[in-house]
Amino acid sequence: MNRIDFKFKELKDQGKKALIPFITAGDPSLDTTVNIVLEMDKKGADIVEIGIPYSDPLADGPIIQGSSQRAIKGGAKIRNIMETVRKIRGKSEIPLVYMVYYSSIFKYGLERFIAEASAVGINGIIIPDLPIEERGDIMDITVKYEVHLIPLVAPTSKRRIQEIAAGGSGFVYCVSKNGVTGVGEKIKTDIKEYMELVGSYTELPKALGFGISGSSMAREFKPYCDGIIIGSAIIDIIYKCKGEKEILDKVGNFISEVKKSLE
């Protein structure tokens, strides 16, 4: 069983919700990325999303864009990110998911990317800009290598939600609002209604992300979904810290606090 499937089943049996933090690989460094993931695992994260930095991340707001730019400037590339994941997997069984833009993996080679991701211990892939017409070809490869292709839906038309949610595996990444990632802007979507709509088209677990800033919002939305995804708030903590020790302390405390709100 894929680690993602096992984790959601385990949490469902316990009546708990998944905490899914996002970080950018290589911000502030690849070595620190390893230690951040291990610390988040220790403090209660259930699944970790690892963003592969991209020069023009259309779905991301300024916080994650800045993180991508810092990681690229620091030398983070797909090849050395794969090695970073291998190091994490050598010390942890936590489910790991890549968030990666389509053009990055297209240039690298679709099958090469997915085969290498599977080999180093990645359990799922989210491609925010994946054209629907390309999904079938990629899904054939992800199935071959036992990696989930996680669909990403937004509060748009019912037909579009149905089309996207019906294809994919692992869980559905439910974007809480139209636009880009980031905290500070009020979520205007009726989350209960939106989650019920997505749930009417798929039996996959539903994880809610974009704009969730911490434990109070996680607590507010947890009745309607199976997991909460938090990215920009964590990236912002990392950016404001001086040195790895402070990063690990503050990110670890944040994860502990949010995890408590989901229990």
Swiss-Prot record:
One of its GO terms (molecular function) is tryptophan synthase activity. Pathway: Amino-acid biosynthesis; L-tryptophan biosynthesis; L-tryptophan from chorismate: step 5/5. It holds the Pfam family Trp_syntA. Keywords: Amino-acid biosynthesis, Aromatic amino acid biosynthesis, Lyase, Tryptophan biosynthesis. Gene3D superfamilies: Aldolase class I. It catalyses: (1S,2R)-1-C-(indol-3-yl)glycerol 3-phosphate + L-serine = D-glyceraldehyde 3-phosphate + L-tryptophan + H2O. Transmembrane segments: none annotated. Its EC number is 4.2.1.20. CDD domains: Tryptophan_synthase_alpha. Belongs to the TrpA family. This is Tryptophan synthase alpha chain. It comes from Clostridium kluyveri (strain ATCC 8527 / DSM 555 / NBRC 12016 / NCIMB 10680 / K1).
